[in-house]
């Protein structure tokens, strides 16, 4: 595969993190994993040159129920409009600032499916941005840097287990589906990639905790990975009775599971509410 940044007459822009998927076998495998169906409400983040967009539209879109897409590159928007017409409704702008909830169908049930080959330079911030729309989302299928996917699905007690692992596992059930080598892209990235499926937990499955406080606790815990939690979570001792929780502070952040972090955040919330 050529290392040229040009593909189909378009120069991939580094500032947009553009690497275009060109391997038809991988594209077919991704579409098979997504299983788009006619009439579903689906949005693609960063459709690029339409490698995934085309096969998805063929299975899903009608003029009355188009595929939605969020794209920042104006040059690509013109090409996509010309190619797909009324079967693709484009939203020009930055996915990090886009209100995905605005695309959900009316009603209480989740209705939105989100897909995309996410720009690797903004993948973590974008995943956190999308968390706020989880109540209206059926599922998400993303191409990401393999290292990020490994962190997303990592188990406690492993080096890959991180703040990203805790926060996303709190909100989603996640599975790594497909490994994708660099040569599947033009230009090839310098890293391996993978497809991940993310399904939000149902409301009744979510622990009753303020996500902001959970994020605060987890961020503190992972702020100095090599230090014991007695140091990184020491500031919470006036709020949380760690002994009563059965929470051992003589551990490092990566050794603590999601449920334990939730209990600490719940205790911190309760203590603050009682003051």
UniProtKB/Swiss-Prot annotation:
Per the UniProt record, which EC number(s) apply here?
2.1.1.182
UniProt: S-adenosyl-L-methionine binding residues: 19, 21, 46, 71, 94, 117
Single GO term (MF): 16S rRNA (adenine(1518)-N(6)/adenine(1519)-N(6))-dimethyltransferase activity
| Name of a matching Pfam family | RrnaAD
Q: Which InterPro entries match?
A: KsgA/Erm, rRNA_Ade_diMease-like_C, rRNA_Ade_methylase_Trfase_N, rRNA_adenine_dimethylase, SAM-dependent_MTases_sf
Q: What keywords is this UniProt entry annotated with?
A: Cytoplasm, Methyltransferase, RNA-binding, rRNA processing, S-adenosyl-L-methionine, Transferase
What do the Gene Ontology cellular component annotations say? cytosol
Primary location: cytoplasm
Q: Does the keyword Nucleotidyltransferase apply?
A: no
Record localization: Cytoplasm
Q: Which SUPFAM superfamilies match?
A: S-adenosyl-L-methionine-dependent methyltransferases (SSF53335)
Recorded catalytic reaction(s): these are: adenosine(1518)/adenosine(1519) in 16S rRNA + 4 S-adenosyl-L-methionine = N(6)-dimethyladenosine(1518)/N(6)-dimethyladenosine(1519) in 16S rRNA + 4 S-adenosyl-L-homocysteine + 4 H(+)
Indicate the segments annotated as coiled coil, or none if absent.
none
Which SMART domains does this entry report, sorted A to Z? rADc (SM00650)
The reply to whether Membrane figures as a keyword in the UniProt entry is no
In terms of superkingdom, the source organism counts as Bacteria
Q: What does this protein do?
A: Specifically dimethylates two adjacent adenosines (A1518 and A1519) in the loop of a conserved hairpin near the 3'-end of 16S rRNA in the 30S particle. May play a critical role in biogenesis of 30S subunits.
* HAMAP family per the UniProt record, alphabetical: 16SrRNA_methyltr_A
Name the family the entry cites: Belongs to the class I-like SAM-binding methyltransferase superfamily. rRNA adenine N(6)-methyltransferase family. RsmA subfamily.
Q: What is this protein called?
A: Ribosomal RNA small subunit methyltransferase A
Which gene does this sequence derive from? rsmA
